[in-house]
Amino acid sequence: LYSSAASDVYKRQPIARRIVEVRATEPIATSGQLVSLVDSVIPKAHRATGNPAKRVFQALRIEVNGELDKLSRTLPKIALHLREHGRLVVESYHSLEDTAVKRFMNQGLTVDVPANMPVIPDDAQPFFKALTRGAMKASKEEIVHNTRSSSVRLRAVELCRPIPERWIPRLEDEAAGRKAIKGGR
C-alpha cells in the first residue's frame, strides 16, 4: 500500500499499519478479512462513495500484476512503431493509468525547448497532435447502457511527423523499462 498504485487509496498508511498488526498475529486468508480490516480503519462518515476496500483491492491488483510498469513500457513501444499519421488511442480505467497516459502523450505534444528561446528548431517541435481535448468521458446515455463505462477516460494522439532522432533512445529506454515515463511511476 506504499506503492504508487495505492496513491489514491484513502487512509492508505493507517490501513497498511493495520494490515501489518493483524498479520503479526494471524494471516489474512480471505478477502472478507481484508474488507473487515479496511472497514475498521475507515470511519463510516467517509464511506459515501461505496466500499472503501474496493480501492485497496484495486491497488493490490495493480501492484501485483505490474500494470503501471507494463503500461509505461507499452506506450513507447507503440509510439516507436507508429507511421506518420498513425494514431494512438488509449482507454484508461482509473486515474493512475490516465495520469501515465497523459504524461506520455504530453511528451510529444509540447515544444521541447526553454521558454525564452526565440526560434524553435524543427526537431523540438511536437511530434504528436492531440485528437481529443483532454480526456473524453462516456456520455450519460452510454453510462445508462453500460455502467462500467463511467470510469473510462479516452485520450488520442496522431503522429504528425516522424519522431525526432534524439527522442528515439529515450523511448527505447522507456520501452525496455530502463527509464520510467517522466512523472509516471
Briefly describe each language-model feature range:
Residues A24, L82-R83:
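Helix-to-beta-strand junctions that scaffold the AdoMet/dcAdoMet cofactor pocket
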Residues L1-A6, Y10:
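Single conserved hydrophobic/aromatic residue that forms the stacking wall/gate
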Residues P14-A16:
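P-loop NTPase catalytic cores that bind/hydrolyze ATP
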